[in-house]
Amino acid sequence: MGHREELIERSIPFLREVKDMTPGADMERWLNKKYGENSDLYKDLSRLIKIGLEEGWAANIEISGPNYRRSKILEPTPETFHFSITAVYMNSKDPRAFEHDDNDDVLRGDYHGHPYGELNMVVPLDKGAQLKGLQGWQGPGWTCA
């Protein structure tokens, strides 16, 4: 089994557990408490996604140049309870590399929608990197949208 398949298989029990939950602030707190950066699940998935970046199967499609990439690791399937798995890479070390109408120095992903919500596992590659979630800025851990 390759690392991509290992990531998918490791995700399925987690997806089974969260399939009937509603993304929001309560779920974000729950995820960070139960599956935060010191949990086995977080450690396994973050290790596999980092390997995916190295092997070139995770976040390998440029959206706005090499500093903003993503890839669909898995389309929704019955096996994953109709969740998809997507990897996103954002390098905001040089905010001038990203144009914003409001001249804000915060990197934003392209607009996209999720009718049933979104769970984001935040895997910083650099110390101090964060993603804004419902509870504010989040380093290693989870956000919901």
Model-derived features with residue positions:
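Conserved hydrophobic/aromatic beta-strand scaffold that supports enzyme active sites
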Residues: 87, 120-122, 139-142
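Short acidic-glycine-tyrosine-enriched beta hairpin
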Residues: 128-145
